[in-house]
Protein backbone atom coordinates (compact mmCIF):
# COMPACT_ATOMS: atom_id res chain seq x y z
CA UNK A 1 0.00 0.00 0.00
CA UNK A 2 1.34 3.41 -0.94
CA UNK A 3 2.07 5.86 1.85
CA UNK A 4 2.58 9.61 1.83
CA UNK A 5 6.22 10.66 1.30
CA UNK A 6 8.18 11.50 4.43
CA UNK A 7 9.75 14.99 4.73
CA UNK A 8 13.11 13.49 3.73
CA UNK A 9 11.54 11.88 0.67
CA UNK A 10 9.79 15.13 -0.24
CA UNK A 11 13.09 17.00 -0.17
CA UNK A 12 14.71 14.23 -2.21
CA UNK A 13 11.87 14.45 -4.71
CA UNK A 14 12.37 18.20 -5.11
CA UNK A 15 16.14 17.78 -5.44
CA UNK A 16 15.59 15.06 -8.03
CA UNK A 17 13.30 17.36 -10.00
CA UNK A 18 15.99 20.06 -9.99
CA UNK A 19 18.55 17.50 -11.14
CA UNK A 20 16.16 16.38 -13.88
CA UNK A 21 16.00 19.92 -15.22
CA UNK A 22 19.79 20.11 -15.11
CA UNK A 23 19.96 16.82 -17.02
CA UNK A 24 17.70 18.10 -19.82
CA UNK A 25 20.58 18.91 -22.23
CA UNK A 26 21.86 15.34 -21.84
CA UNK A 27 18.36 13.97 -22.43
CA UNK A 28 18.03 15.99 -25.64
CA UNK A 29 21.50 14.95 -26.79
CA UNK A 30 20.60 11.29 -26.28
CA UNK A 31 17.30 11.81 -28.09
CA UNK A 32 19.07 13.24 -31.12
CA UNK A 33 21.58 10.37 -31.09
CA UNK A 34 18.76 7.85 -30.94
CA UNK A 35 16.92 9.52 -33.80
CA UNK A 36 20.03 9.49 -36.00
CA UNK A 37 21.04 5.95 -35.05
CA UNK A 38 17.73 4.08 -35.06
CA UNK A 39 15.11 6.44 -36.44
CA UNK A 40 11.92 8.06 -35.16
CA UNK A 41 10.37 4.94 -33.58
CA UNK A 42 13.24 4.33 -31.16
CA UNK A 43 13.48 8.05 -30.43
CA UNK A 44 9.76 8.13 -29.63
CA UNK A 45 10.10 5.09 -27.35
CA UNK A 46 12.96 6.85 -25.56
CA UNK A 47 10.77 9.91 -25.00
CA UNK A 48 7.85 7.79 -23.75
CA UNK A 49 10.16 6.06 -21.26
CA UNK A 50 11.67 9.34 -20.07
CA UNK A 51 8.44 11.28 -19.60
CA UNK A 52 6.66 8.31 -18.01
CA UNK A 53 9.40 8.31 -15.36
CA UNK A 54 9.01 12.06 -14.87
CA UNK A 55 5.25 11.76 -14.40
CA UNK A 56 4.92 8.49 -12.48
CA UNK A 57 8.38 8.19 -10.92
CA UNK A 58 9.01 4.80 -12.55
CA UNK A 59 9.68 3.55 -16.10
CA UNK A 60 7.04 1.76 -18.18
CA UNK A 61 7.11 -1.94 -17.35
CA UNK A 62 7.33 -3.03 -21.00
CA UNK A 63 10.50 -0.94 -21.47
CA UNK A 64 12.28 -2.28 -18.39
CA UNK A 65 11.55 -6.01 -17.96
CA UNK A 66 14.60 -7.88 -19.31
CA UNK A 67 13.71 -11.14 -17.55
CA UNK A 68 10.90 -11.88 -15.09
CA UNK A 69 13.31 -11.23 -12.20
CA UNK A 70 15.54 -8.52 -13.66
CA UNK A 71 14.42 -5.04 -14.71
CA UNK A 72 16.51 -2.10 -15.90
CA UNK A 73 15.79 1.58 -16.42
CA UNK A 74 16.38 5.15 -15.35
CA UNK A 75 16.19 6.89 -11.98
CA UNK A 76 13.01 6.21 -10.02
CA UNK A 77 11.58 8.50 -7.33
CA UNK A 78 9.84 8.09 -3.98
CA UNK A 79 6.54 8.38 -5.83
CA UNK A 80 7.60 5.68 -8.27
CA UNK A 81 8.90 3.16 -5.75
CA UNK A 82 5.41 1.76 -4.93
CA UNK A 83 4.93 1.16 -8.67
CA UNK A 84 8.14 -0.85 -8.77
CA UNK A 85 7.02 -2.78 -5.69
CA UNK A 86 3.77 -3.63 -7.46
CA UNK A 87 5.91 -5.26 -10.15
CA UNK A 88 7.60 -7.34 -7.46
CA UNK A 89 10.85 -5.36 -7.26
CA UNK A 90 12.57 -6.10 -3.95
CA UNK A 91 16.11 -4.83 -4.56
CA UNK A 92 17.87 -2.00 -6.39
CA UNK A 93 21.31 -1.59 -7.93
CA UNK A 94 22.26 2.03 -8.61
CA UNK A 95 25.19 2.91 -10.90
CA UNK A 96 24.82 6.72 -10.71
CA UNK A 97 28.02 8.34 -9.49
CA UNK A 98 26.10 11.60 -9.19
CA UNK A 99 23.17 10.39 -7.07
CA UNK A 100 22.89 7.90 -4.19
CA UNK A 101 19.38 6.54 -3.55
CA UNK A 102 20.28 5.77 0.07
CA UNK A 103 21.35 9.34 0.82
CA UNK A 104 18.13 10.56 -0.78
CA UNK A 105 16.08 8.25 1.45
CA UNK A 106 14.53 6.26 -1.41
CA UNK A 107 16.60 3.07 -1.33
CA UNK A 108 15.04 -0.24 -0.23
CA UNK A 109 16.78 -2.40 2.41
CA UNK A 110 18.27 -4.57 -0.36
CA UNK A 111 20.37 -1.95 -2.10
CA UNK A 112 23.75 -1.92 -3.83
CA UNK A 113 25.50 1.29 -4.83
CA UNK A 114 28.13 1.02 -7.58
CA UNK A 115 28.98 4.66 -8.42
CA UNK A 116 30.11 4.94 -12.02
CA UNK A 117 30.81 8.15 -13.95
CA UNK A 118 28.33 8.71 -16.79
CA UNK A 119 29.37 7.39 -20.23
CA UNK A 120 32.11 5.21 -18.71
CA UNK A 121 32.12 1.45 -18.07
CA UNK A 122 31.95 0.09 -14.53
CA UNK A 123 35.06 -1.61 -13.21
CA UNK A 124 35.24 -5.39 -13.56
CA UNK A 125 35.07 -5.82 -9.79
CA UNK A 126 31.93 -3.67 -9.67
CA UNK A 127 30.43 -5.82 -12.41
CA UNK A 128 31.18 -8.84 -10.22
CA UNK A 129 29.69 -7.17 -7.14
CA UNK A 130 26.56 -6.39 -9.11
CA UNK A 131 26.30 -9.87 -10.60
CA UNK A 132 26.63 -11.58 -7.20
CA UNK A 133 24.08 -9.21 -5.67
CA UNK A 134 21.59 -9.90 -8.47
CA UNK A 135 22.17 -13.65 -8.31
CA UNK A 136 21.72 -13.78 -4.54
CA UNK A 137 18.57 -11.67 -4.61
CA UNK A 138 16.97 -13.73 -7.38
CA UNK A 139 17.99 -16.99 -5.70
CA UNK A 140 16.17 -15.86 -2.56
CA UNK A 141 12.99 -15.19 -4.53
CA UNK A 142 13.55 -11.47 -5.10
CA UNK A 143 13.37 -9.27 -8.17
CA UNK A 144 16.00 -6.64 -9.00
CA UNK A 145 15.82 -3.19 -10.61
CA UNK A 146 19.13 -1.91 -12.02
CA UNK A 147 19.28 1.77 -12.87
CA UNK A 148 21.43 4.74 -13.81
CA UNK A 149 20.19 8.19 -14.84
CA UNK A 150 18.44 7.30 -18.10
CA UNK A 151 18.79 3.52 -18.20
CA UNK A 152 20.65 3.43 -21.51
CA UNK A 153 24.35 3.01 -20.64
CA UNK A 154 25.78 2.21 -17.23
CA UNK A 155 22.85 0.14 -15.98
CA UNK A 156 22.48 -1.91 -19.16
CA UNK A 157 26.21 -2.65 -19.09
CA UNK A 158 25.82 -4.37 -15.73
CA UNK A 159 22.74 -6.24 -16.95
CA UNK A 160 24.65 -7.37 -20.05
CA UNK A 161 27.49 -8.64 -17.84
CA UNK A 162 24.98 -10.54 -15.70
CA UNK A 163 23.45 -12.19 -18.78
CA UNK A 164 26.90 -13.12 -20.09
CA UNK A 165 27.71 -14.59 -16.68
CA UNK A 166 24.53 -16.68 -17.05
CA UNK A 167 25.84 -18.15 -20.31
CA UNK A 168 24.81 -15.76 -23.09
CA UNK A 169 27.26 -14.36 -25.63
CA UNK A 170 27.71 -10.58 -25.62
CA UNK A 171 25.61 -10.22 -28.78
CA UNK A 172 22.86 -12.38 -27.26
CA UNK A 173 22.98 -10.32 -24.06
CA UNK A 174 22.61 -7.00 -25.90
CA UNK A 175 19.83 -8.45 -28.07
CA UNK A 176 17.96 -9.63 -24.96
CA UNK A 177 18.17 -6.16 -23.43
CA UNK A 178 17.19 -4.42 -26.67
CA UNK A 179 14.03 -6.50 -26.85
CA UNK A 180 12.89 -4.69 -23.71
CA UNK A 181 14.67 -1.36 -24.27
CA UNK A 182 15.21 -0.78 -28.01
CA UNK A 183 16.73 2.64 -27.34
CA UNK A 184 19.73 1.69 -25.18
CA UNK A 185 22.95 3.54 -26.03
CA UNK A 186 25.99 1.80 -24.51
CA UNK A 187 29.24 3.56 -25.33
CA UNK A 188 32.06 1.88 -27.23
CA UNK A 189 33.92 1.49 -23.94
CA UNK A 190 30.95 -0.19 -22.28
CA UNK A 191 30.49 -2.58 -25.21
CA UNK A 192 34.22 -3.38 -25.23
CA UNK A 193 34.11 -4.14 -21.51
CA UNK A 194 31.41 -6.77 -22.03
CA UNK A 195 33.48 -8.40 -24.79
CA UNK A 196 36.49 -8.45 -22.47
CA UNK A 197 34.38 -9.76 -19.60
CA UNK A 198 33.08 -12.61 -21.77
CA UNK A 199 36.60 -13.55 -22.88
CA UNK A 200 38.06 -13.54 -19.38
CA UNK A 201 34.97 -14.70 -17.46
CA UNK A 202 36.44 -13.87 -14.03
CA UNK A 203 35.62 -15.84 -10.91
CA UNK A 204 33.41 -13.18 -9.39
CA UNK A 205 33.06 -14.82 -5.99
CA UNK A 206 36.84 -15.06 -5.60
CA UNK A 207 37.43 -11.54 -6.95
CA UNK A 208 34.93 -9.91 -4.59
CA UNK A 209 36.09 -11.84 -1.52
CA UNK A 210 39.78 -11.14 -2.16
Name what the model sees in each region:
Residues 11-13, 40, 82, 133, ...:
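Low-complexity, charged, repeat-rich alpha-helical/coil interaction segments
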Residues 141-160:
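A phosphate-binding catalytic loop at a beta-strand-loop-alpha-helix junction
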Residues 1-55:
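Non-catalytic regulatory/accessory regions that flank a structured catalytic core
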Residues 32-33, 99, 157:
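Sequence-pattern detector for short linear motifs
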Residues 203-210:
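PRPP-dependent phosphoribosyltransferase catalytic core
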Amino acid sequence: MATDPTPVEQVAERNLFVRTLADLPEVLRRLWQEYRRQGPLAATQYLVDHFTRLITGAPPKHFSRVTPDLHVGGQYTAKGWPLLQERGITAVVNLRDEFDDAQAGIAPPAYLYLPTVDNTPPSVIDLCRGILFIENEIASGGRVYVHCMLGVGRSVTLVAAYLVHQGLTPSEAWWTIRKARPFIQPTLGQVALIEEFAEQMPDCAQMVSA
